[in-house]
């Protein structure tokens, strides 16, 4: 593994452990050339996924983009980073095990919304507003109506 500080290839793993859900191995490394310490994560990748965008363009699936969009939806919400990482891993596993090498951005959006719906109401509404391209207040009212008819004890509810 190349050192991110000095670009040396002479690095060693000092500590290695699985994450809570055992889907990722966290490795603590040290560069033998400059003593820089850094962390890497190792994940199983079942297949290369290609995303078919709404305009028909095909792009490689980007796990980091998924993480960023969830972090934006969950900004200032009482959800631990570990739960976000667990959710991202579950979404990626679901996508990879679906049997298709190409998957539409709409399908990804729906899967993300399913996971957010069971995690946090506010994040769900935030994500839905961008994903579904809300234009009017009634768009929000429709989603809020859906949420108020459900009762999931794992979810962080909207304030009443």
Swiss-Prot record:
PROSITE patterns named among the record's database cross-references: ATP_CONE
Residue ranges covered by zinc fingers (unnamed): 3-34
Claim: DNA-binding is one of the keywords in the record: yes
GO molecular function: ATP binding; DNA binding; zinc ion binding
Bridged cysteine pairs (disulfide): none
Cofactor note: Binds 1 zinc ion.
Record has Repressor as a keyword: yes
Keywords attached to this entry: ATP-binding, DNA-binding, Metal-binding, Nucleotide-binding, Repressor, Transcription, Transcription regulation, Zinc, Zinc-finger
GO biological process: negative regulation of DNA-templated transcription
Cofactor(s) required for function per UniProt: Zn(2+)
Pfam families recorded: ATP-cone, Zn_ribbon_NrdR
InterPro entries in alphabetical order: ATP-cone_dom, NrdR-like_N, RNR_NrdR-like
Described function: Negatively regulates transcription of bacterial ribonucleotide reductase nrd genes and operons by binding to NrdR-boxes.
Family: Belongs to the NrdR family.
Protein name: Transcriptional repressor NrdR
């Amino acid at each position: 593994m190349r050192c991110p500080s000095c670009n040396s290839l002479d690095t060693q793993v000092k500590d290695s452990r699985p994450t809570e859900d055992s889907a990722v191995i966290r490795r603590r490394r040290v560069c033998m050339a400059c003593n820089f310490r850094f962390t890497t994560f190792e994940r199983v990748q079942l297949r290369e996924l290609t995303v078919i965008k709404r305009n028909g363009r095909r792009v490689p699936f980007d796990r980091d983009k998924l993480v960023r969009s969830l972090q934006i939806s969950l900004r200032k919400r009482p959800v631990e980073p570990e739960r976000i990482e667990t959710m991202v891993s579950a979404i990626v596993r679901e996508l990879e095990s679906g049997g298709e090498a190409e998957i539409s951005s709409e399908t990804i959006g729906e899967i993300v919304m399913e996971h957010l719906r069971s995690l946090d109401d506010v994040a769900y509404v935030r994500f839905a507003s961008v994903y579904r391209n809300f234009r009017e207040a009634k768009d929000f009212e429709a989603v809020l109506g859906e949420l108020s008819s459900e009762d999931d004890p794992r979810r962080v509810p909207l304030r009443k």
